[in-house]
Amino acid sequence: MMRSILLMLFILSSSAYGTEVDEELKSILRETIEKSSSFEDRFEAEVWLLQKSTVLAKFIPNATDRLSLLKDIHNASTEAGLPPEFVLALIEVESHFDRFAISSAGAQGLMQIMPFWKKEIGRPQDNLADIKTNLRYGCTILKYYLNRADNNWAEALARYNGSYGKFWYPRRVMTAWEKNWR
């Protein structure tokens, strides 16, 4: 009951600041929360999804697609032991949330995974444009580099990007995190 009251206060305060929360978004948000298992509780899910959805709207206008992606990012990142907000920042820098993005080096999808990883792990049939597959690969790779770097985010991000020893890439991810996802 208290959680519902707090959510309504949050929604009403959003309306007071001119950011109208429409009925369709509220309905989609409820459905997404019901299907998500990576949150501690329903209230945490409601607040996190609503906050991040507002920021993600500039990249993904469709509310259903946006909330579905946020749920997938939260699930994959928490399963890998990563903060979802850092994964959001990395995706913003890597692909601007374009699941079909392909870099000049051939990296694919949201988290820009190099296709050689499919062969390396014996799964050549995997589709890196598939959101859940791409997130699973990306979060696992990032967590590996974070462990290898003794939880030094700058080093882990540079390794992830293939720019170890340089810090322009970690700065870009950290800036995106501070500006949009923190």
Whereabouts are the PLM-identified features?
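Catalytic glycan-binding domains that act on GlcNAc-containing polysaccharides
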Residues: 20-182
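Sec-dependent N-terminal signal peptides
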Residues: 4-13
